[in-house]
């Protein structure tokens, strides 16, 4: 029982940290005993999270462009681009977003 309570408390702490760092996610949750319920729709959180990640990647790209060219900066720019591509594939993997409801 105590392990479950600790895990629940850890999860709540993580969500509150995310909430603090990204208020634009507007996370709404209800905690009742050891049960946590998100009041946001999964699709809403998905879209907002994708936007937050894209914004962070763009900020990283902007910051990297301030440094002189070097192999390390070039590798970081390359990895940033790969992260954007992986995020695009994550978006595309949600086929329900692109297909008609049956």
Swiss-Prot record:
It comes from the Bacteria. Keywords: Plasmid. This is Virulence plasmid protein pGP4-D.
């Amino acid at each position: 029982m105590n392990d479950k309570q600790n895990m629940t408390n850890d999860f709540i702490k993580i969500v509150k940290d995310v909430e603090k760092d990204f208020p634009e996610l507007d996370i709404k949750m209800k905690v009742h005993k050891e049960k946590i319920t998100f009041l946001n729709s999964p699709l809403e959180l998905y879209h907002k999270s994708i936007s937050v990640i894209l914004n962070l990647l763009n900020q990283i790209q902007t910051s990297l462009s301030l440094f002189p060219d070097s192999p390390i900066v070039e590798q970081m720019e390359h990895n940033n681009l790969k992260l954007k591509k992986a995020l695009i594939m994550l978006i595309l993997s949600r086929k329900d977003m692109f297909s008609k409801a049956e």
